[in-house]
Amino acid sequence: MIGMLESLQHESDLLQHDQIHTGEKPYECNECRKTFSLKQNLVEHKKMHTGEKSHECTECGKVCSRVSSLTLHLRSHTGKKAYKCNKCGKAFSQKENFLSHQKHHTGEKPYECEKVSIQMPTIIRHQKNHTGTKPYACKECGKAFNGKAYLTEHEKIHTGEKPFECNQCGRAFSQKQYLIKHQNIHTGKKPFKCSECGKAFSQKENLIIHQRIHTGEKPYECKGCGKAFIQKSSLIRHQRSHTGEKPYTCKECGKAFSGKSNLTEHEKIHIGEKPYKCNECGTIFRQKQYLIKHHNIHTGEKPYECNKCGKAFSRITSLIVHVRIHTGDKPYECKVCGKAFCQSSSLTVHMRSHTGEKPYGCNECGKAFSQFSTLALHMRIHTGEKPYQCSECGKAFSQKSHHIRHQRIHTH
Protein backbone atom coordinates (compact mmCIF):
# COMPACT_ATOMS: atom_id res chain seq x y z
CA MET A 1 0.00 0.00 0.00
CA ILE A 2 2.91 2.36 0.85
CA GLY A 3 4.38 1.67 -2.61
CA MET A 4 1.05 2.56 -4.22
CA LEU A 5 0.81 5.87 -2.26
CA GLU A 6 4.39 6.75 -3.17
CA SER A 7 3.62 6.28 -6.87
CA LEU A 8 0.63 8.65 -6.71
CA GLN A 9 2.63 11.84 -6.32
CA HIS A 10 -0.12 14.28 -7.39
CA GLU A 11 -3.56 14.81 -5.86
CA SER A 12 -5.16 14.46 -9.32
CA ASP A 13 -3.53 11.02 -9.71
CA LEU A 14 -4.92 9.93 -6.33
CA LEU A 15 -8.43 11.17 -7.15
CA GLN A 16 -8.35 9.36 -10.48
CA HIS A 17 -7.07 6.17 -8.84
CA ASP A 18 -9.84 6.28 -6.18
CA GLN A 19 -12.40 5.99 -8.96
CA ILE A 20 -11.27 2.39 -9.53
CA HIS A 21 -12.49 1.54 -6.01
CA THR A 22 -15.65 3.72 -5.99
CA GLY A 23 -16.79 2.49 -9.43
CA GLU A 24 -17.15 6.04 -10.71
CA LYS A 25 -16.67 6.33 -14.51
CA PRO A 26 -16.70 10.02 -15.48
CA TYR A 27 -15.05 9.59 -18.92
CA GLU A 28 -17.61 8.86 -21.62
CA CYS A 29 -17.01 7.91 -25.27
CA ASN A 30 -19.05 10.22 -27.52
CA GLU A 31 -19.28 7.48 -30.19
CA CYS A 32 -20.83 4.59 -28.26
CA ARG A 33 -21.44 6.08 -24.75
CA LYS A 34 -19.19 3.56 -23.00
CA THR A 35 -17.73 5.00 -19.77
CA PHE A 36 -14.32 4.64 -18.11
CA SER A 37 -12.81 5.40 -14.71
CA LEU A 38 -9.45 6.45 -16.20
CA LYS A 39 -8.91 8.98 -18.98
CA GLN A 40 -6.12 6.94 -20.62
CA ASN A 41 -8.52 4.00 -20.95
CA LEU A 42 -10.94 6.25 -22.85
CA VAL A 43 -8.10 7.43 -25.12
CA GLU A 44 -7.18 3.80 -25.91
CA HIS A 45 -10.84 2.87 -26.45
CA LYS A 46 -11.41 5.69 -28.97
CA LYS A 47 -8.85 4.09 -31.28
CA MET A 48 -11.44 1.37 -31.98
CA HIS A 49 -13.68 3.98 -33.61
CA THR A 50 -10.99 5.93 -35.45
CA GLY A 51 -9.31 2.78 -36.75
CA GLU A 52 -5.95 3.92 -35.35
CA LYS A 53 -3.65 0.98 -34.69
CA SER A 54 -0.29 2.01 -33.29
CA HIS A 55 0.96 -1.21 -31.66
CA GLU A 56 2.61 -3.56 -34.17
CA CYS A 57 3.47 -7.26 -33.81
CA THR A 58 7.12 -7.92 -34.68
CA GLU A 59 6.31 -11.50 -35.73
CA CYS A 60 3.62 -11.03 -38.38
CA GLY A 61 3.10 -7.26 -38.65
CA LYS A 62 -0.46 -7.19 -37.30
CA VAL A 63 -1.24 -3.86 -35.67
CA CYS A 64 -3.47 -3.44 -32.64
CA SER A 65 -5.15 -0.36 -31.19
CA ARG A 66 -4.22 -1.29 -27.61
CA VAL A 67 -1.15 -2.68 -25.83
CA SER A 68 -3.36 -5.26 -24.09
CA SER A 69 -4.66 -6.47 -27.47
CA LEU A 70 -1.10 -6.82 -28.76
CA THR A 71 -0.10 -8.78 -25.63
CA LEU A 72 -2.98 -11.22 -26.20
CA HIS A 73 -2.15 -11.50 -29.91
CA LEU A 74 1.51 -12.34 -29.20
CA ARG A 75 0.36 -15.49 -27.42
CA SER A 76 -0.75 -16.88 -30.80
CA HIS A 77 2.96 -16.98 -31.72
CA THR A 78 4.43 -18.06 -28.37
CA GLY A 79 1.69 -20.57 -27.59
CA LYS A 80 1.59 -19.27 -24.01
CA LYS A 81 -1.60 -20.28 -22.19
CA ALA A 82 -1.56 -18.57 -18.80
CA TYR A 83 -5.11 -19.44 -17.73
CA LYS A 84 -5.68 -23.08 -16.71
CA CYS A 85 -8.99 -24.65 -15.73
CA ASN A 86 -8.72 -26.47 -12.38
CA LYS A 87 -11.66 -28.72 -13.33
CA CYS A 88 -10.40 -30.32 -16.55
CA GLY A 89 -6.89 -28.93 -17.01
CA LYS A 90 -7.63 -27.15 -20.31
CA ALA A 91 -5.51 -24.02 -20.77
CA PHE A 92 -6.28 -20.72 -22.51
CA SER A 93 -4.25 -17.76 -23.74
CA GLN A 94 -7.02 -15.22 -23.03
CA LYS A 95 -8.79 -14.61 -19.72
CA GLU A 96 -12.25 -14.10 -21.25
CA ASN A 97 -12.02 -17.48 -23.05
CA PHE A 98 -10.99 -19.10 -19.76
CA LEU A 99 -13.91 -17.53 -17.86
CA SER A 100 -16.34 -18.46 -20.64
CA HIS A 101 -15.03 -22.07 -20.57
CA GLN A 102 -15.57 -22.37 -16.79
CA LYS A 103 -19.27 -21.74 -17.32
CA HIS A 104 -19.45 -25.12 -19.12
CA HIS A 105 -18.71 -26.74 -15.75
CA THR A 106 -21.08 -24.53 -13.71
CA GLY A 107 -23.80 -24.33 -16.37
CA GLU A 108 -23.92 -20.56 -15.92
CA LYS A 109 -25.08 -18.49 -18.91
CA PRO A 110 -25.53 -14.95 -17.53
CA TYR A 111 -25.49 -13.11 -20.85
CA GLU A 112 -27.50 -15.07 -23.37
CA CYS A 113 -29.00 -13.88 -26.62
CA GLU A 114 -32.72 -14.66 -26.93
CA LYS A 115 -32.17 -15.83 -30.54
CA VAL A 116 -29.10 -18.05 -30.18
CA SER A 117 -26.81 -19.07 -27.31
CA ILE A 118 -23.98 -16.54 -27.46
CA GLN A 119 -22.42 -15.05 -24.34
CA MET A 120 -20.71 -11.80 -23.36
CA PRO A 121 -18.51 -9.98 -24.29
CA THR A 122 -19.70 -10.60 -27.86
CA ILE A 123 -23.46 -10.40 -27.22
CA ILE A 124 -23.80 -6.62 -27.73
CA ARG A 125 -22.01 -6.79 -31.08
CA HIS A 126 -23.80 -10.03 -31.98
CA GLN A 127 -27.31 -8.67 -31.25
CA LYS A 128 -26.83 -6.15 -34.06
CA ASN A 129 -27.21 -9.13 -36.41
CA HIS A 130 -30.81 -9.46 -35.19
CA THR A 131 -31.65 -5.76 -34.78
CA GLY A 132 -29.94 -4.82 -38.04
CA THR A 133 -28.32 -1.78 -36.40
CA LYS A 134 -25.63 -0.46 -38.75
CA PRO A 135 -25.01 3.21 -37.94
CA TYR A 136 -21.93 3.65 -40.16
CA ALA A 137 -22.87 4.09 -43.84
CA CYS A 138 -20.57 4.45 -46.86
CA LYS A 139 -21.18 7.74 -48.70
CA GLU A 140 -20.20 6.17 -52.03
CA CYS A 141 -22.44 3.10 -52.24
CA GLY A 142 -24.64 3.29 -49.14
CA LYS A 143 -23.44 0.01 -47.63
CA ALA A 144 -23.73 0.17 -43.83
CA PHE A 145 -21.62 -1.33 -41.05
CA ASN A 146 -22.01 -1.85 -37.30
CA GLY A 147 -18.49 -0.55 -36.59
CA LYS A 148 -16.61 2.50 -37.80
CA ALA A 149 -13.40 0.51 -38.33
CA TYR A 150 -15.24 -1.77 -40.82
CA LEU A 151 -16.46 1.29 -42.72
CA THR A 152 -12.93 2.75 -42.86
CA GLU A 153 -11.60 -0.49 -44.39
CA HIS A 154 -14.52 -0.71 -46.84
CA GLU A 155 -13.99 2.85 -48.13
CA LYS A 156 -10.59 1.84 -49.51
CA ILE A 157 -12.44 -0.23 -52.15
CA HIS A 158 -13.76 3.00 -53.66
CA THR A 159 -10.59 5.06 -53.29
CA GLY A 160 -8.39 2.21 -54.53
CA GLU A 161 -5.81 3.31 -51.99
CA LYS A 162 -3.02 0.73 -51.67
CA PRO A 163 -0.01 2.52 -50.21
CA PHE A 164 1.92 -0.59 -49.16
CA GLU A 165 3.82 -2.20 -52.05
CA CYS A 166 5.84 -5.44 -52.07
CA ASN A 167 9.42 -4.76 -53.23
CA GLN A 168 9.70 -8.36 -54.49
CA CYS A 169 6.78 -8.59 -56.92
CA GLY A 170 5.20 -5.14 -56.89
CA ARG A 171 1.83 -6.22 -55.49
CA ALA A 172 0.17 -3.45 -53.46
CA PHE A 173 -2.02 -3.60 -50.35
CA SER A 174 -4.38 -1.28 -48.48
CA GLN A 175 -2.93 -2.18 -45.08
CA LYS A 176 0.60 -2.77 -43.86
CA GLN A 177 -0.39 -5.99 -42.07
CA TYR A 178 -1.57 -7.49 -45.40
CA LEU A 179 1.77 -6.61 -47.01
CA ILE A 180 3.73 -8.25 -44.18
CA LYS A 181 1.57 -11.39 -44.44
CA HIS A 182 2.13 -11.45 -48.21
CA GLN A 183 5.90 -11.08 -47.83
CA ASN A 184 5.99 -14.38 -45.93
CA ILE A 185 5.42 -16.01 -49.35
CA HIS A 186 8.79 -14.66 -50.53
CA THR A 187 10.71 -15.14 -47.25
CA GLY A 188 9.25 -18.55 -46.49
CA LYS A 189 8.54 -17.42 -42.93
CA LYS A 190 5.77 -19.46 -41.27
CA PRO A 191 5.16 -18.09 -37.77
CA PHE A 192 1.81 -19.84 -37.17
CA LYS A 193 2.24 -23.45 -36.04
CA CYS A 194 -0.42 -26.12 -35.49
CA SER A 195 -0.22 -27.44 -31.92
CA GLU A 196 -1.68 -30.80 -33.04
CA CYS A 197 0.62 -31.86 -35.90
CA GLY A 198 3.33 -29.18 -36.05
CA LYS A 199 2.51 -27.96 -39.56
CA ALA A 200 3.37 -24.27 -39.97
CA PHE A 201 1.67 -21.52 -41.98
CA SER A 202 2.56 -18.03 -43.18
CA GLN A 203 -0.90 -16.66 -42.32
CA LYS A 204 -3.06 -17.14 -39.23
CA GLU A 205 -6.24 -17.60 -41.33
CA ASN A 206 -4.68 -20.64 -43.02
CA LEU A 207 -3.82 -22.13 -39.62
CA ILE A 208 -7.42 -21.66 -38.43
CA ILE A 209 -8.73 -23.45 -41.55
CA HIS A 210 -6.14 -26.25 -41.13
CA GLN A 211 -7.07 -26.83 -37.47
CA ARG A 212 -10.59 -27.74 -38.59
CA ILE A 213 -9.10 -30.94 -40.04
CA HIS A 214 -8.27 -31.98 -36.46
CA THR A 215 -11.47 -30.70 -34.81
CA GLY A 216 -13.77 -31.90 -37.60
CA GLU A 217 -15.50 -28.52 -37.64
CA LYS A 218 -17.27 -27.72 -40.93
CA PRO A 219 -19.03 -24.37 -40.42
CA TYR A 220 -20.08 -23.78 -44.03
CA GLU A 221 -23.14 -25.84 -44.99
CA CYS A 222 -24.83 -26.07 -48.38
CA LYS A 223 -28.54 -25.23 -48.10
CA GLY A 224 -29.20 -27.29 -51.21
CA CYS A 225 -27.95 -30.71 -50.07
CA GLY A 226 -26.64 -30.27 -46.52
CA LYS A 227 -23.00 -31.02 -47.35
CA ALA A 228 -20.61 -29.07 -45.09
CA PHE A 229 -17.15 -27.62 -45.69
CA ILE A 230 -14.25 -26.29 -43.63
CA GLN A 231 -13.82 -23.13 -45.70
CA LYS A 232 -16.20 -20.74 -47.43
CA SER A 233 -14.45 -20.93 -50.82
CA SER A 234 -15.10 -24.70 -50.94
CA LEU A 235 -18.80 -24.10 -50.28
CA ILE A 236 -19.01 -21.47 -53.05
CA ARG A 237 -17.30 -23.85 -55.50
CA HIS A 238 -19.61 -26.71 -54.44
CA GLN A 239 -22.76 -24.61 -54.88
CA ARG A 240 -21.88 -24.27 -58.56
CA SER A 241 -22.61 -28.00 -58.92
CA HIS A 242 -26.24 -27.11 -58.15
CA THR A 243 -26.44 -23.88 -60.17
CA GLY A 244 -24.31 -25.11 -63.09
CA GLU A 245 -22.33 -21.86 -63.00
CA LYS A 246 -18.91 -22.05 -64.69
CA PRO A 247 -17.32 -18.59 -64.51
CA TYR A 248 -13.79 -19.57 -65.56
CA THR A 249 -13.36 -19.96 -69.35
CA CYS A 250 -10.32 -21.22 -71.28
CA LYS A 251 -9.17 -18.62 -73.83
CA GLU A 252 -7.81 -21.34 -76.12
CA CYS A 253 -10.80 -23.63 -76.59
CA GLY A 254 -13.66 -21.91 -74.76
CA LYS A 255 -14.22 -24.69 -72.23
CA ALA A 256 -15.68 -23.39 -68.96
CA PHE A 257 -14.98 -24.49 -65.38
CA SER A 258 -16.58 -23.96 -61.98
CA GLY A 259 -13.22 -23.50 -60.22
CA LYS A 260 -10.15 -21.44 -61.09
CA SER A 261 -7.79 -24.29 -60.16
CA ASN A 262 -9.61 -26.56 -62.65
CA LEU A 263 -9.04 -23.99 -65.39
CA THR A 264 -5.34 -23.66 -64.46
CA GLU A 265 -4.87 -27.44 -64.73
CA HIS A 266 -6.81 -27.57 -68.02
CA GLU A 267 -4.65 -24.84 -69.57
CA LYS A 268 -1.59 -27.09 -69.17
CA ILE A 269 -3.09 -29.31 -71.90
CA HIS A 270 -2.65 -26.50 -74.42
CA ILE A 271 0.85 -25.45 -73.36
CA GLY A 272 1.98 -29.05 -72.76
CA GLU A 273 3.31 -28.24 -69.29
CA LYS A 274 4.08 -31.29 -67.14
CA PRO A 275 6.36 -30.16 -64.30
CA TYR A 276 6.21 -33.32 -62.14
CA LYS A 277 8.50 -36.19 -63.19
CA CYS A 278 8.75 -39.70 -61.76
CA ASN A 279 12.38 -40.46 -60.86
CA GLU A 280 11.73 -44.20 -61.34
CA CYS A 281 10.46 -44.35 -64.94
CA GLY A 282 10.57 -40.75 -66.16
CA THR A 283 6.79 -40.40 -66.63
CA ILE A 284 5.73 -36.78 -66.26
CA PHE A 285 2.50 -35.39 -64.84
CA ARG A 286 0.59 -32.11 -64.87
CA GLN A 287 -0.27 -32.32 -61.17
CA LYS A 288 1.79 -33.33 -58.14
CA GLN A 289 -1.09 -35.45 -56.78
CA TYR A 290 -0.98 -37.61 -59.93
CA LEU A 291 2.76 -38.19 -59.44
CA ILE A 292 2.25 -39.26 -55.81
CA LYS A 293 -0.49 -41.70 -56.84
CA HIS A 294 1.70 -42.99 -59.70
CA HIS A 295 4.56 -43.80 -57.27
CA ASN A 296 2.43 -46.59 -55.78
CA ILE A 297 2.86 -48.48 -59.09
CA HIS A 298 6.59 -48.79 -58.36
CA THR A 299 6.34 -49.42 -54.60
CA GLY A 300 3.46 -51.86 -55.00
CA GLU A 301 1.79 -50.38 -51.94
CA LYS A 302 -1.97 -51.03 -51.86
CA PRO A 303 -3.28 -50.02 -48.44
CA TYR A 304 -6.99 -49.90 -49.36
CA GLU A 305 -8.71 -53.32 -49.40
CA CYS A 306 -12.24 -54.25 -50.45
CA ASN A 307 -14.04 -56.09 -47.62
CA LYS A 308 -16.24 -57.89 -50.17
CA CYS A 309 -13.66 -59.60 -52.39
CA GLY A 310 -10.29 -58.69 -50.83
CA LYS A 311 -8.98 -56.75 -53.83
CA ALA A 312 -6.52 -54.04 -52.76
CA PHE A 313 -5.90 -50.59 -54.20
CA SER A 314 -3.22 -47.93 -54.00
CA ARG A 315 -5.82 -45.12 -53.78
CA ILE A 316 -8.95 -44.81 -51.64
CA THR A 317 -10.84 -43.27 -54.58
CA SER A 318 -10.16 -46.43 -56.61
CA LEU A 319 -11.57 -48.54 -53.77
CA ILE A 320 -14.74 -46.38 -53.58
CA VAL A 321 -15.30 -46.78 -57.33
CA HIS A 322 -14.58 -50.55 -57.13
CA VAL A 323 -17.11 -51.11 -54.32
CA ARG A 324 -19.81 -49.86 -56.71
CA ILE A 325 -19.27 -53.05 -58.76
CA HIS A 326 -20.64 -55.01 -55.78
CA THR A 327 -23.39 -52.55 -54.85
CA GLY A 328 -24.38 -51.72 -58.45
CA ASP A 329 -24.44 -48.06 -57.51
CA LYS A 330 -24.19 -45.71 -60.52
CA PRO A 331 -24.73 -42.21 -59.12
CA TYR A 332 -23.72 -40.26 -62.24
CA GLU A 333 -26.53 -40.17 -64.80
CA CYS A 334 -26.54 -38.59 -68.27
CA LYS A 335 -29.38 -36.07 -68.54
CA VAL A 336 -29.53 -36.55 -72.32
CA CYS A 337 -29.93 -40.33 -72.69
CA GLY A 338 -30.26 -41.58 -69.10
CA LYS A 339 -27.16 -43.79 -69.15
CA ALA A 340 -25.60 -44.06 -65.68
CA PHE A 341 -21.97 -44.40 -64.57
CA CYS A 342 -20.13 -45.26 -61.38
CA GLN A 343 -17.51 -42.53 -61.93
CA SER A 344 -18.04 -38.81 -62.61
CA SER A 345 -15.09 -38.87 -65.05
CA SER A 346 -16.86 -41.56 -67.12
CA LEU A 347 -19.95 -39.37 -67.35
CA THR A 348 -17.82 -36.38 -68.41
CA VAL A 349 -16.25 -38.42 -71.24
CA HIS A 350 -19.65 -39.84 -72.23
CA MET A 351 -21.22 -36.36 -72.48
CA ARG A 352 -18.73 -35.54 -75.23
CA SER A 353 -20.44 -38.16 -77.42
CA HIS A 354 -23.50 -35.89 -77.33
CA THR A 355 -21.75 -32.52 -77.55
CA GLY A 356 -19.02 -33.60 -79.98
CA GLU A 357 -16.47 -31.83 -77.79
CA LYS A 358 -12.83 -32.83 -78.36
CA PRO A 359 -10.73 -30.70 -76.00
CA TYR A 360 -7.44 -32.59 -76.41
CA GLY A 361 -5.64 -31.50 -79.58
CA CYS A 362 -2.40 -32.89 -81.04
CA ASN A 363 0.31 -30.21 -81.33
CA GLU A 364 1.86 -32.07 -84.28
CA CYS A 365 -1.04 -32.61 -86.69
CA GLY A 366 -3.99 -30.85 -85.07
CA LYS A 367 -6.15 -33.95 -84.68
CA ALA A 368 -8.44 -33.64 -81.65
CA PHE A 369 -9.71 -36.23 -79.17
CA SER A 370 -12.39 -36.44 -76.49
CA GLN A 371 -10.07 -38.16 -73.99
CA PHE A 372 -6.54 -37.30 -72.89
CA SER A 373 -5.57 -41.00 -72.84
CA THR A 374 -6.51 -41.29 -76.53
CA LEU A 375 -4.33 -38.27 -77.33
CA ALA A 376 -1.43 -39.86 -75.41
CA LEU A 377 -1.75 -43.03 -77.54
CA HIS A 378 -1.99 -40.97 -80.73
CA MET A 379 1.20 -39.03 -79.89
CA ARG A 380 3.20 -42.27 -80.12
CA ILE A 381 2.59 -42.21 -83.90
CA HIS A 382 4.68 -39.03 -84.05
CA THR A 383 7.26 -39.94 -81.39
CA GLY A 384 7.66 -43.58 -82.45
CA GLU A 385 7.45 -44.65 -78.81
CA LYS A 386 6.67 -48.37 -78.31
CA PRO A 387 6.79 -49.10 -74.58
CA TYR A 388 5.29 -52.64 -74.72
CA GLN A 389 7.88 -55.26 -75.77
CA CYS A 390 7.31 -58.97 -76.33
CA SER A 391 9.57 -61.06 -74.06
CA GLU A 392 9.54 -63.94 -76.59
CA CYS A 393 10.61 -62.26 -79.86
CA GLY A 394 11.44 -58.67 -78.87
CA LYS A 395 8.80 -57.02 -81.05
CA ALA A 396 7.56 -53.74 -79.58
CA PHE A 397 4.14 -52.07 -79.62
CA SER A 398 2.75 -48.60 -78.94
CA GLN A 399 -0.44 -49.92 -77.31
CA LYS A 400 -0.90 -52.49 -74.55
CA SER A 401 -3.88 -54.13 -76.32
CA HIS A 402 -1.73 -54.78 -79.43
CA HIS A 403 0.97 -56.32 -77.23
CA ILE A 404 -1.52 -58.70 -75.55
CA ARG A 405 -3.00 -59.73 -78.93
CA HIS A 406 0.50 -60.43 -80.29
CA GLN A 407 1.45 -62.64 -77.33
CA ARG A 408 -1.33 -65.05 -78.26
CA ILE A 409 0.74 -66.02 -81.34
CA HIS A 410 3.36 -67.54 -79.03
CA THR A 411 0.89 -69.27 -76.69
CA HIS A 412 -1.06 -71.06 -79.50
Curated annotation (Swiss-Prot):
Induction pattern: Up-regulated by activation of alpha1-adrenergic receptors.
Ranges annotated as C2H2-type zinc finger: 27-49, 55-77, 83-105, 136-158, 164-186, 192-214, 220-242, 248-270, 276-298, 304-326, 332-354, 360-382, 388-412
Gene: ZNF260
Origin organism lineage: Eukaryota, Metazoa, Chordata, Craniata, Vertebrata
GO terms under cellular component: cytosol; nucleoplasm; nucleus
GO molecular function per UniProt: DNA-binding transcription factor activity, RNA polymerase II-specific; RNA polymerase II cis-regulatory region sequence-specific DNA binding; zinc ion binding
Subunit structure, interactors included: Binds DNA. Interacts with GATA4.
Compartments (UniProt record): Nucleus
Function, as annotated: Transcription factor that acts as a cardiac regulator and an effector of alpha1-adrenergic signaling. Binds to PE response elements (PERE) present in the promoter of genes such as ANF/NPPA and acts as a direct transcriptional activator of NPPA. Also acts as a cofactor with GATA4, a key cardiac regulator.
Xref: InterPro entries: Krueppel_C2H2_ZnFinger, Znf_C2H2_sf, Znf_C2H2_type
Protein family per UniProt: Belongs to the krueppel C2H2-type zinc-finger protein family.
GO biological process: regulation of transcription by RNA polymerase II
Protein name per the record: Zinc finger protein 260
Signal peptide: none
Record-annotated disulphide pairs: none
Pfam families listed in its UniProt record: zf-C2H2, zf-H2C2_2
Keywords (A to Z) from UniProt: Activator, Developmental protein, DNA-binding, Metal-binding, Nucleus, Repeat, Transcription, Transcription regulation, Zinc, Zinc-finger
Keyword Zinc: yes
Species, as recorded: Homo sapiens (Human)
